[in-house]
UniProtKB/Swiss-Prot annotation:
It comes from Microcystis aeruginosa (strain NIES-843 / IAM M-2473). This is Elongation factor P. Belongs to the elongation factor P family. InterPro entries: Elong-fact-P_C, NA-bd_OB-fold, Rib_uL2_dom2, Transl_elong_fac_P/YeiP, Transl_elong_KOW-like, Transl_elong_P/YeiP_cen, Transl_elong_P/YeiP_CS, Transl_elongation_fac_P. One of its GO terms (biological process) is peptide biosynthetic process. Gene3D superfamilies: 2.30.30.30, Nucleic acid-binding proteins (2.40.50.140). The gene is efp.
Amino acid sequence: MISSNDFRSGTTIEIDGSVWRVVEFLHVKPGKGSAFVRTKLKNVQTGNVVERTFRAGETLPSATIEKRTMQHTYKEGDQFVFMDMETFEEATLTPVQMGDRAKYLKEGMEVNILFWNDQVLDIELPTSVILEITDTDPGVKGDTATGGTKPAIVETGAQVMVPLFISIGERIKVDTRDGSYLGRE
């Protein structure tokens, strides 16, 4: 159990059989009446965001989320299959669960998968990945590091904006949170 006074961003609670993550919280102490906590909660399973108010000191069941490191082994149809390298258990994620993160996922990559009651909730990719450029416009003599950017397609099919001097076959570091170019590898 967790008190509403102990809410922090990232705290996970269980409400009506669903797992919710606290996105924002604000402790309010009005001049008249009792204190309360105004929160913005995100459903970890569906991604829905709701605003909810709790009385100060109200206790709620905390959701125990287990984080396991798993390796992306292969893609079966549109499903992504991951394997725990210690127990050899497999977990499957749908394209909806993967979202935009699928475009940075390579076979053999290790990721963290979040479980609740043996159900797959979410996936956490590393903050950056090394990807190879498969298609981009050729660099022209005179292109500099301080110049503009151009679109490039990486081995996973994602489009990344890269500096003009980057060419096909080079390996670059990409931020998985926003898809930005971080540098050469």
